């Protein structure tokens, strides 16, 4: 993926990794559009980054995804990079049945269905561009799950698998498929549960990870993690079992 002169759409771009990525891509000479559910957060992002374009959209809603696609192609016909960043993370205890499954959002719809659907919508357009990319934001937990976040981890594992197959299908086109698999990053993602689990401020900053991601792009990497995640991704079966037990021994 080239580093400049792109037109980039970032879902969930009003905070955290999405906003930091938008900031850095603007600095590199790209045109950047962010979308998010909150008009207030989008306005704050616009105030912070006056050159950014914003669009209110809840990508957990299928009809809004389709409307976003139509709007984006009409307003930005040269759009050549899609970043599927929007996501939520929930602590769910299945001993409680369905009590927590759909409260505060549907992880499967937002974390997996939305990026799959958006990828399908935009791919025909992206294939017409001389250079294009789809960036999927997964997680280090795609490689070894934290049991307190069971559905989140499963959606990220599914999105990792989807990224592999989509990359294979598009291998002879102009569209690169790039996976961002960050470690724990100190954003507002699921702050209440992180506080409860003692995970607050134990991650790296958005600035640090986005710099790592951009460095990976320069090197031509298609799957960009960091040293923390590489240990999970590259684990042997024995290591995997040990890491799973280690990661989940302090589960509440």
From Swiss-Prot:
The active site is at 152 (proton acceptor). CDD domains: SDR_c2. Its main location: cytoplasm. GO terms for molecular function: oxidoreductase activity. Its EC number is 1.-.-.-. It is an enzyme of class 1 (oxidoreductase). Transmembrane segments: none annotated. NADP(+) binds at residues 9-33. Keywords: Cytoplasm, NAD, Oxidoreductase. SUPFAM superfamilies: NAD(P)-binding Rossmann-fold domains. Disruption phenotype: Cells lacking this gene have no defect in lipoteichoic acid or wall teichoic acid synthesis. Belongs to the short-chain dehydrogenases/reductases (SDR) family. This is Uncharacterized oxidoreductase DltE. It comes from Bacillus subtilis (strain 168). The gene is dltE.
């Amino acid at each position: 993926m080239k580093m400049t002169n792109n037109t980039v759409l970032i879902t969930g771009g009003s905070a955290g990794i999405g906003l930091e990525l938008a900031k850095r891509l603007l600095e590199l000479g790209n045109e950047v559009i962010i979308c998010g559910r909150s008009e207030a957060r989008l306005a704050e992002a616009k105030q912070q980054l006056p050159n950014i374009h914003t669009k209110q959209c809840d990508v957990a809603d299928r009809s809004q995804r389709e409307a976003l696609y139509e709007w984006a192609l009409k307003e930005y016909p040269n759009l050549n990079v899609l970043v599927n960043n929007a996501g939520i993370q929930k602590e769910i205890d299945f001993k409680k049945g369905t009590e927590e499954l759909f409260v505060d959002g549907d992880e499967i719809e937002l974390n997996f269905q939305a990026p799959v659907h958006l990828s399908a919508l935009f791919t025909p357009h992206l294939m017409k561009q001389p250079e294009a990319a789809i960036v999927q934001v997964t997680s280090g937990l795609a490689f070894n799950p934290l049991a307190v976040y069971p559905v989140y981890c499963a959606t990220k594992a599914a999105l990792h698998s989807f990224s592999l197959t989509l990359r294979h299908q598009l291998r002879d086109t102009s569209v690169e498929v790039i996976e961002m698999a960050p470690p724990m990053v100190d954003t507002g993602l699921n702050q209440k549960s992180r506080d409860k689990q003692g995970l607050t401020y134990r991650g790296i900053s958005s600035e640090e990870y986005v710099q790592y991601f951009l460095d990976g792009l320069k090197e031509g990497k298609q799957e960009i993690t960091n040293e923390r995640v590489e240990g999970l991704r590259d684990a042997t079966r024995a290591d995997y079992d040990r890491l799973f037990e280690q990661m989940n021994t302090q589960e509440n």
